[in-house]
């Protein structure tokens, strides 16, 4: 009888231990959900474990997250991503590749990321709004649905690129440290860069600009204004210009030693085709 009792007790203890162990295995930690490499880069998220609404932790294990680099169509399943806890975040890039139309991500908020320097997003077709922190130096927005964008807090921004989206209006008057500015395939009707005296590289293509003033940008080294309605470009006050790209037939006023390229309609069609293929 005692032996039977001991045997039953042993079996019950074994069951309890196995149940406890299986319970431990079911506990999901940040290490199971997020992969951070030795360079403090978050490069993988297991969406099966996190679900579509992501809250990124400050660190995974002892590894503090400083960079977020997500490059895969898999991440088109993300509905929201909260990075407010990532206090050491310096770099954020999200590229959904060719599944952008399936994305539901409408907003990115970096207002809490005081060390963030670079923001880059590509093929996030649902994205309508980005809230920046004043620390940002570089902003690159490709293939989004952003119509309006507030850049007033970005006094230290040095690089801004917007390409292929419905952008209607943008104000650069407070971005006086901007050195590189590129806008392509957007709905803007005018771009005022008079306040950008440090500007070195400017590109504007695939927009309905009728005229353009670069007289207040003495440090300008390259200018690309093609596939627009601009017919005259005055470079009289731009002695540092090294390269000019304009539509065929554009009148250039002022003496310049810059290399000049005139874009034909055939050139532009070829470029459009390459962009569509990529």
Locations of the language-model features?
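Intrinsically disordered low-complexity segments with strong compositional bias
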Residues: 137, 150, 156, 171, ...
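Polar/charged low-complexity regions in secreted precursors and cytosolic/nuclear IDRs
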Residues: 82, 98, 107-109, 128, ...
């Amino acid at each position: 009888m005692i032996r039977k009792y001991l045997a039953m007790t042993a079996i019950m203890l074994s069951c309890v231990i196995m149940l406890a162990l299986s319970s431990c295995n079911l506990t999901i930690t940040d290490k199971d959900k997020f992969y951070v490499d030795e360079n403090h880069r978050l490069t993988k998220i297991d969406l099966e474990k996190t679900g579509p609404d992501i809250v990124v932790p400050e660190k995974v294990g002892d590894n503090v997250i400083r960079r977020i680099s997500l490059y895969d169509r898999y991440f088109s399943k993300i509905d929201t991503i909260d990075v407010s806890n990532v206090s050491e975040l310096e770099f954020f890039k999200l590229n959904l590749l060719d599944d952008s139309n399936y994305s539901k991500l409408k907003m990115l908020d970096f207002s809490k990321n005081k060390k963030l320097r670079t923001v880059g997003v590509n093929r996030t077709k649902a994205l309508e709004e980005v809230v920046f922190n004043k620390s940002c130096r570089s902003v690159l927005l490709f293939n989004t649905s952003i119509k309006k964008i507030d850049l007033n807090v970005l006094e230290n921004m040095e690089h801004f690129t917007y390409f292929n989206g419905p952008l209607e209006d943008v104000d650069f008057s407070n971005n006086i440290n901007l050195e590189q500015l590129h806008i392509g395939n957007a709905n803007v009707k005018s771009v005022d860069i008079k306040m950008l005296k440090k500007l070195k590289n400017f590109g504007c293509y695939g927009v309905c600009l009728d005229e353009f003033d670069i007289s207040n940008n003495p440090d300008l080294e390259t200018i690309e204004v093609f596939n627009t309605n601009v017919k005259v470009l005055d470079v009289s006050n731009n002695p540092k210009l090294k390269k000019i790209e304009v539509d065929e037939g554009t009148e250039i006023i002022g003496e310049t030693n810059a290399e000049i390229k005139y874009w034909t309609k055939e050139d532009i069609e070829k470029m459009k085709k390459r962009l569509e293929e990529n």
